[in-house]
Design a protein with these regions (language model features):
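Conserved beta-strand-loop-beta-strand hairpin that lines the nucleotide-binding pocket
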Residues: 1-21, 66-123
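STAS-typified acidic loop motif
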Residues: 21-32
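A generic structural micro-environment signature
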Residues: 28-30, 53, 106, 117
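Conserved short strand/loop->alpha-helix "switch" segment adjacent to the catalytic nucleotide/phosphoryl-transfer site
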Residues: 32-60
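Polybasic, low-complexity association/targeting segments
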Residues: 58-68
Length: 123
């Protein structure tokens, strides 16, 4: 946790920036919770239904990716940070799970280093 705190120091309390942080266990049941948290936080921006749906989809995909690929064998932590500055929403999803061995190769179409088989691949 000390590493995580160092990442946030100096960035958290900035004038004119509203922030939210949630720590989640890497459990698939938390994917929907993360979506709802972000959707609730962004209501202060008065988004359209389509904008809210787009953000919820992106959060769902990112959290699911952290759960499936970051922690395939064990539970771990996922940090969700949201910030609103002026009219911009920033969402950061971070895990400390298994990394990507070859980032360059991972950018290739249909590449997967999945331990669960070929049913999932990056597009």
């Amino acid at each position: 946790m000390e590493e995580q705190q160092k990442e946030l120091d100096g960035k958290w309390l900035q004038e004119g920036v509203q922030r939210m942080m949630v720590m989640l266990e890497s459990d698939s049941r938390n994917e929907s919770f993360a979506r709802v948290c972000v959707a609730s936080f962004m209501t202060r921006m008065n988004p359209t239904v389509a904008e809210t749906d787009d953000v919820k989809t992106a959060v769902s995909e990112a959290v699911t990716n952290s759960i499936v690929h970051g922690y395939p064998y064990e539970k771990g932590l996922i940090r969700l940070v949201c910030a609103i500055e002026k009219d911009t929403l920033t969402v950061q999803i971070r895990d400390w799970g298994r990394g990507i061995e070859n980032v360059k190769k991972a950018m290739e179409p249909m590449y997967s280093q999945s331990v669960r088989g070929p049913e999932r691949s990056g597009m």
